[in-house]
Structures are given as C-alpha cells and as structure tokens.
C-alpha cells in the first residue's frame, strides 16, 4: 500500500493538522517506508508458528519480576475520614453539583 501526497494532505486535514508541503512530503516518505515494512512482515509465512507472549520466551524461561503481594499497612477508615468535613455511614458527603 503506497500513499500519495494527496492522501497525506487529506489525512492531515481530517485530523485538523496544518502541514507545510515540505513536511507532508517528508511524512509521505516515512509512512510509505512503514507500510513497506508492514507488507514485508505480512508476506512471511507464519502458519504453524505459535504466537509469543514475550519475545525471549523461546530462549529462556520467562517469569514476571514482581514481588508477592503483602499487607504493608492497615487502612483504618475511621482515621482516614476523621478530617473530612462530612461523613455518613462510612461515605464522604459532598455538595450537590448537578441538578
């Protein structure tokens, strides 16, 4: 898929972008290079190849590097609501802003 300069200008117009002719020509080159790369990737036969969730999972075992969840502090709702101007049944009361 190759774009033309008219296509780039139309897309810029639809996106409400002001684009000088030199910038549009530069963008045209970049977009056509990108679409060329996409066409090359689509031409590769990937039948029978399982998708990868992580790019290096074929090389080594991949484990998430996250710590285990652990309680670090106890949240006391009453203490947190004490400075609030108005609270009822554990809920913060705020002024009505929409009629």
From Swiss-Prot:
Allows the formation of correctly charged Asn-tRNA(Asn) or Gln-tRNA(Gln) through the transamidation of misacylated Asp-tRNA(Asn) or Glu-tRNA(Gln) in organisms which lack either or both of asparaginyl-tRNA or glutaminyl-tRNA synthetases. The reaction takes place in the presence of glutamine and ATP through an activated phospho-Asp-tRNA(Asn) or phospho-Glu-tRNA(Gln). Belongs to the GatC family. It comes from Burkholderia cenocepacia (strain ATCC BAA-245 / DSM 16553 / LMG 16656 / NCTC 13227 / J2315 / CF5610). Transmembrane segments: none annotated. SUPFAM superfamilies: Glu-tRNAGln amidotransferase C subunit. It catalyses: L-glutamyl-tRNA(Gln) + L-glutamine + ATP + H2O = L-glutaminyl-tRNA(Gln) + L-glutamate + ADP + phosphate + H(+); L-aspartyl-tRNA(Asn) + L-glutamine + ATP + H2O = L-asparaginyl-tRNA(Asn) + L-glutamate + ADP + phosphate + 2 H(+). Pfam families: GatC (PF02686). This is Aspartyl/glutamyl-tRNA(Asn/Gln) amidotransferase subunit C.
